[in-house]
Amino acid sequence: MRQQRLAYSLGLLVLICVYFFLRTDLANSSVQSRLQTCSEGWYITGYYVPREDELPDTAEQISVERMGDLSFSQKFLSEIRTEGWGITRFGWALGYYSGRWHRSDVGALDAAGNLLVDGAIAIDRALIPRGADVQISTLPTPWATKTFRATDIGNGIVGQHIDVFTGTGLAAEEETFRITSNNNRVCFMSN
């Protein structure tokens, strides 16, 4: 009887150990799937959304999809051609892509048509997966401590190049100049 109890207890102990071993192994697998990947030598640039009221200039007439002909500041239009989107004096966003001008009532959009938000970055999807959390610790404060989200792409974003969205207006433009740099350390975790 005593030997049966001992064998039963020993069997139960083995089962408990196997259970915890498997549980720990599975937990480690899920941690490993979210391990951070880091590398050096990244080129970082910034992009922003210009405001028409901050860029007065001679008026230029353009044709906006589904709206017709409208006039905007030439400096403003030039910035949009570079940056992708801008906020008009009317309060809606004006975008330039596929060789045409477009209106968005919700704001500036990323390449997938989603609202462009703080913390967004444009990446080369061959190197960083879409939706990955990205940290660039070599940027100046406060950017070095931010966690960015890889949600956007851009024509000029190829290889070890990340374009950080810095916000709206002239202050955001100044940040693009401040963060543009070479030889940055980039770490990311894919979701």
Regions found by a protein language model. Give the residues of each.
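Short, intrinsically disordered low-complexity segments
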Residues: M1-Q4, L22, S33
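Hydrophobic alpha-helical membrane-insertion segments, chiefly the h-region
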Residues: V14-R23
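Solvent-exposed, well-ordered loop and adjacent helix/strand elements within mature globular domains
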Residues: D25-N191
